[in-house]
């Protein structure tokens, strides 16, 4: 876990953003940095070692499994952690308000 991932984890663990996230979650053959199953939201922390093609394939797969995706750079987490946490909280609320009702 990178320093940025650890900082983000401390900020979101235990329903701090309105949802329960787990870290290093296997979803299919990928591992999400952080994932919530209610609502279905994956958070990825990017560094310079990630390849664009790999990121694109991961995003496509997670979305095909019904997850929304948020991506933050290590730099953004380091410089703007409160804003990152606010964005996550807003997405949790948005997904819950707009998910389809069961038939």
Please describe what each predicted stretch is.
Residues 1, 23-94:
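Basic, amphipathic alpha-helical patches used to engage nucleic acids or provide basic targeting signals
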Residues 1-19, 64, 92-103:
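Solvent-exposed, charged helical/coil patches
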